């Protein structure tokens, strides 16, 4: 019930007791923090009361700096000066071209997290955005005859989605952006899986797409419906 939820430390304590341990005998969250501070050098002089008095503290907060440290490394690092390594710019694996003239990147919205499995269960958060959206610059939208919140299709060499356009100057000309929280229009069905040669990370943040307005009166279909029709 609201107001009666248990803190993480209480669940951890209950689990420990079920396993036969009596070591986690905290009475409240402050006791947990005190234990953390006792074994963490950077937190040694911290306490709930000092945090409340100072509206927070910057670590390290220890015997040498009991009021916290405004700048962590002002002269050097514990192991000496930082080692700066040069990097060479490598262009994206799949740039926009005549067939797919816009560059797509993916983004997150502050209303949702990850695939939305938790945040989309909240009616308050869910009402803030439509289930899927593509951010597009006014210049590109005008060139493509796309209206604000108009129904559109987005296609790459790997996938096809239907969603709605959000016209905004937040994205530059030539770039479109799509959040990845929505199962109705999962943007990562469009993205490129080309890998970085060193880290093997896929290049999910850049690919070429073709954006078109849907026929008048046609609503965007969720990907589940598109898959059934294919």
Annotate each PLM feature.
Residues 1-54, 115, 121-135, 139-230:
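Long, contiguous, secondary-structure-rich segments that constitute the structural scaffold
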Residues 28-124:
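Long, low-complexity segments enriched in small/aliphatic residues
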């Amino acid at each position: 019930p609201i107001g009666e939820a248990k803190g993480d430390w209480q669940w951890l304590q209950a689990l420990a007791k079920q396993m036969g341990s009596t070591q986690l005998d905290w009475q409240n969250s402050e006791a947990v923090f005190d234990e953390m501070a006792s074994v963490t050098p950077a937190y040694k002089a911290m306490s709930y009361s000092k945090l409340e008095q100072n509206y927070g503290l910057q670590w390290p907060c220890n015997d040498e700096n009991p009021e916290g440290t405004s700048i962590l490394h002002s002269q050097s690092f514990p192991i000496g000066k930082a080692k700066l390594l040069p990097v060479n710019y490598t262009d994206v694996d799949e740039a926009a071209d005549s067939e797919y003239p816009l560059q797509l990147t993916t983004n997150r919205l502050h209303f949702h997290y990850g695939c939305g499995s938790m945040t989309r269960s909240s009616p308050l958060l869910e009402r803030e955005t439509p289930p899927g959206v593509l951010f597009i610059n006014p210049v590109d939208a005008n060139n493509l005859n796309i209206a604000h919140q108009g129904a559109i299709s987005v296609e790459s060499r790997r996938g096809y989605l239907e969603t709605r356009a959000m016209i905004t100057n937040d994205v530059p000309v030539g770039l479109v952006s799509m959040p990845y929280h929505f199962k109705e229009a999962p943007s990562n069905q469009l993205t490129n899986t080309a890998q970085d040669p060193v880290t093997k990370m896929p290049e999910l943040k850049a690919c070429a797409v073709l954006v078109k307005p849907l026929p008048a009166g046609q609503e965007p279909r969720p990907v589940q419906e598109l898959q059934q029709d294919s």
